[in-house]
From Swiss-Prot:
Active site positions: 49 (proton acceptor), 60 (proton acceptor)
This protein's encoding gene: trpA
PANTHER family: TRYPTOPHAN SYNTHASE ALPHA CHAIN, CHLOROPLASTIC, TRYPTOPHAN SYNTHASE, ALPHA CHAIN
One Pfam family per UniProt: Trp_syntA
Enzyme class: lyase
Keywords for this protein: Amino-acid biosynthesis, Aromatic amino acid biosynthesis, Lyase, Tryptophan biosynthesis
Species name: Yersinia pestis bv. Antiqua (strain Angola)
InterPro entries listed in its UniProt record: Aldolase_TIM, RibuloseP-bd_barrel, Trp_synthase_alpha_AS, Trp_synthase_suA
Family listed: Belongs to the TrpA family.
CDD domains, alphabetized: Tryptophan_synthase_alpha
Name of the protein in question: Tryptophan synthase alpha chain
C-alpha cells in the first residue's frame, strides 16, 4: 500500500499525474508478458494494473477478452500469473502493482489464501470488478489483514453515500470510471467528472485514477485538467492490449509501438 503513497507524493512534488497501463498477465505468453511489462516500465509507466485471465470477464470488451484467450492458449493459469508477478516485483522493487480481478478467481482457494499469495509476491492492490461495494466486506477485510489495498470503482453516477463509503474503505487509489459499460478504447470516456473528484477529495479518499476509454494523450490531459479538480492520473488498457494484439507475430515491432505509446501518454501527465 505504501508504494502508492510514495508514488503520489513523488508525482505531486514534480507536478505530474500518474500514467498506469493495464495488460493481461501471460498475454501472449508468459515470457513475452514479462518483456512487455519491462517495456511499459522502461517507457515511463508509474504503476501497473494487471489482469489475471478469466473465462467469463463481464466488465471487459472484446479486446481484453481476446487477451485472456491468448493467455489461455499459451497455458497460463493463476499459478503462472503469480510466478510472473513475483518476477516483476523482484526486478522492480518500487513500482506499485495492482491486480484487476473477478471474484471467482479470489474465491477459488479461499479469500484469505488469495490475499496471502498477493502479499507474498509483492502485489500492492486488488480491484475485484464484479463485486459491488455493498458485498465487499469479506474481501476488504482479508486485503487489509495482508497489507493489500482494496480498490473500489467510483461510477459516474455515484451518490454521496457511496462516495463516503469508498473514501472510508478504499486504500491506494480510487478507480474513477469515465463511463458505464464495458472496457474499450473505441468507447471514449466522458468528461468532466470533476464534481466526483472534488467530493472524493473532501472525504479524504485515496487519489482518483480515471479509467475506461482512455486511449490518447489528449484524454490523459483532460482527466488531469481543471487544476486541483482533476484526477491524480489515468489508466489505459484496451489501447495497449490492441497494440499487443496487432503485433503478436512481430514482437520487436510490438515493443517499439508500446514504448512510443507509453512515452506519449506519460508526457501528457506533465503539466
Amino acid at each position: 500500500m505504501e508504494r502508492y503513497q510514495q508514488l503520489f507524493k513523488q508525482l505531486a512534488a514534480k507536478k505530474e499525474g500518474a500514467f498506469v497501463p493495464f495488460v493481461q498477465l501471460g498475454d501472449p505468453s508468459p515470457a513475452m508478458s514479462l518483456n512487455i511489462i519491462d517495456t511499459l516500465i522502461a517507457a515511463g509507466a508509474d504503476a501497473l494494473e494487471l489482469g489475471i485471465p478469466f473465462s467469463d470477464p463481464l466488465a471487459d470488451g472484446p479486446t481484453i477478452q481476446n487477451a485472456a484467450l491468448r493467455a489461455f492458449a499459451a497455458g497460463v493459469t493463476p499459478g503462472i500469473c503469480f510466478e510472473i508477478l513475483a518476477e516483476i516485483r523482484q526486478k522492480h522493487p518500487t513500482i506499485p502493482i495492482g491486480l484487476l480481478m473477478y471474484a471467482n478467481l479470489v474465491f477459488h482457494n479461499g479469500i484469505d489464501h488469495f490475499y496471502q499469495r498477493c502479499a507474498e509476491v509483492g502485489v500492492d492492490s486488488v480491484l475485484i470488478a464484479d463485486v459491488p461495494f455493498e458485498e465487499s466486506a469479506p474481501f476488504r477485510a482479508a486485503a487489509l489483514r495482508h497489507g493489500i489495498a482494496p480498490i473500489f470503482i467510483c461510477p459516474p453516477n455515484a451518490d454521496d453515500d457511496l462516495l463516503r463509503e469508498i473514501a472510508s474503505h478504499g486504500r491506494g487509489y480510487t478507480y474513477l470510471l469515465s463511463r458505464a459499460g464495458v472496457t474499450g478504447a473505441e468507447n471514449h470516456g466522458q468528461l468532466p467528472l470533476n464534481h466526483l473528484v472534488d467530493k472524493l477529495r473532501e472525504y479524504n479518499a485515496a487519489p482518483a485514477l480515471q479509467g475506461f476509454g482512455i486511449s490518447e494523450p489528449a484524454q490523459v490531459k483532460a482527466s488531469l485538467a481543471a487544476g486541483a479538480a482533476g484526477a491524480a492520473g489515468a489508466i489505459s488498457g484496451s489501447a495497449i492490449v490492441k497494440i499487443i494484439e496487432k503485433n503478436v507475430a512481430q514482437p520487436v515491432e510490438m515493443l517499439v509501438q508500446l514504448t512510443r505509446f507509453v512515452t506519449e501518454m506519460k508526457a501528457a501527465t506533465r503539466s
